[in-house]
Amino acid sequence: LSCPDQQITWLRNLLGNIGNVFHVGTEPGLGQSMKLANNLLSAAALAITSEAMVMGVKAGLDPHIMLEVINAGSGKNTATQDKFPKAILTRSFDRGFTNSLMHKDVELFLEEAQSLKVPTGVASAVQKLWQTACSEIGPGADFTTIVQCVENRAGVEVKGT
């Protein structure tokens, strides 16, 4: 949250039962900037993990073993710990967030970064993959279907056994 210091206790009491409450500052807009940064990291983690997993499976690696190794090392992230084992390897694609919403979040990050004159080379690449997911897989499809964009180009499917 971004709010005056004297309001944070009241807001923590009000919102603490429905989620984590962090006070990121007092200036208006800081909460939004924090949310955009977090959402970009989530989008990038899922996109890059999709590429890594597709490469590994195409090379002959077992996706379950890949996740076990990655999650024991420095590459672990929310995609490897949650989305791949629960929604992608199972092919359920059911995390409840759409490609269009993730694409919108990345677009909003890029707009904010541009207004602050922050370079966005990696974020721009992430945005392009989400745009592809919207056009090829569908804007209303679950955001975990982004792996299918990479799978389709590589000619391999990442799935559990």
Give, region by region, the residue ranges found by the protein language model.
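Short, basic/aromatic-enriched C-terminal tail that caps enzymatic domains
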Residues: 141-161
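Interdomain hinge/lid region at the active-site interface
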Residues: 32, 82-143, 150
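Electropositive, surface-exposed helix/loop patches at the edges of structured domains
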Residues: 22-24, 100-104, 155-161
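Residue-level detector of short coil/turn "hinge" positions at structural boundaries
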Residues: 63, 120, 140, 157-158
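Internal alpha-helical scaffold of NAD(P)-dependent oxidoreductase catalytic cores
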Residues: 1-34, 41-77, 116
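A generic structural signal for short
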Residues: 40-41, 54-55, 97-98, 135
